[in-house]
From Swiss-Prot:
InterPro entries referenced in this protein's UniProt entry, alphabetically: RecX_HTH_1st (IPR053926), RecX_HTH_2nd (IPR053924), RecX_HTH_3rd (IPR053925), Regulatory_RecX (IPR003783), WH-like_DNA-bd_sf (IPR036388)
Localisation: Cytoplasm
GO cellular component, one term: cytoplasm
Name assigned to this protein: Regulatory protein RecX
Free-text function comment from the UniProt entry: Modulates RecA activity.
HAMAP family: RecX
Principal location class: cytoplasm
Family indicated by similarity: Belongs to the RecX family.
Keywords: Cytoplasm
One GO term of the biological process aspect: regulation of DNA repair
């Protein structure tokens, strides 16, 4: 048996030094001090000392986890990663996670549902990217599917359409075909299915864009026509046409514009 001969406050708030038989033995959190009723003069056997140290390890790990959770919601995997960074053993991590789960500090399904809800509003994402994000965060497939069930087809179309309108502005000088391809790709990158992207593109890019298409192809054709002005006529026409093909313009429109350029050149 060893006797507590001194209890002193550490510089770190909420921590105490325990001296046994006039020698420093270990430090404990205030919660552990209270839980075990540690006081000067109390005698401790080796088994009790081991139990006190184990409880203090849990208290320190719990403090790390709660501080991490105080900033935002996190998954079990993320909390464990944070404790691992602080060199907390896996067995202690499991005990801490069990306490946190019981006290509802962590809940992967709640995290997933909150994440889905947030990604409808802030930095919007589609279901595919959200699913990857949640998997990376350690959420299981069942919880992911449950959370994503709150992301309706109508909401996906509404959010994707807003993103598509922004992309349409970015690609306004592109050919209709190129514009559609780039918008679909942008939406796919954001996590929306190609089915959703196609529906949205058909809404955003309408037949009313014909005038814009004509303006764009004329602008591009004139640039290419000037660029190849030193070529022989046949090569000038060929290279200008090829440039327009690669930008996604259709053959009929290209021929019309090239004809206009040829007429202008003859004049």
């Amino acid at each position: 048996m060893k006797k507590i001969t001194k209890i002193s406050i550490q510089k770190k708030a909420g921590r105490y030094n325990i001296d046994l038989d006039n020698q420093f033995a270990f430090g404990v959190a205030e919660s552990v001090l209270i839980k075990f009723g540690l006081a000067k003069g109390r005698e401790l056997d080796d088994e009790l000392i081991a139990e006190i140290k184990h409880n203090d390890s849990i208290a320190k790990a719990l403090s790390i986890a709660l501080n991490f959770l105080s900033h935002s919601l996190h998954t079990v995997k993320q909390v464990k990663q944070k404790m691992s960074e602080k060199e907390v053993s896996e067995s202690i991590q499991d005990e801490v996670v069990a306490q946190l789960y019981e006290q509802k500090y962590i809940d992967d399904l709640n995290y997933a549902q909150h994440y889905v809800s947030t990604k409808k509003i802030i930095s919007p994402k589609g279901p595919n990217v959200i699913k990857m994000d949640l998997k990376q965060a350690g959420v299981n497939d069942d919880d992911i599917e449950t959370a994503l069930s709150d992301y309706t087809h109508e909401e996906q179309i509404e959010i994707a359409e807003k993103l598509a309108l922004k992309s349409a502005t970015t690609y306004k000088r592109e050919s209709t075909r190129a514009k559609k391809q780039k918008i679909v790709q942008a939406l796919a990158t954001k996590g929306f299915s190609f089915d959703i992207a196609e529906i949205v593109v058909d809404r955003v890019i309408t037949e009313n864009d014909d005038e814009i298409e004509l303006e764009n192809i004329k602008r591009q054709a004139e640039k290419s026509w000037r660029r190849y002005r030193n070529e022989v006529p046949s090569q000038r026409i060929y290279k200008t046409k090829n440039s327009l093909y690669t930008k996604g313009y259709n053959a009929e429109l290209i021929n019309v514009v090239i004809h206009e350029l040829e007429v202008s050149a003859d004049d």
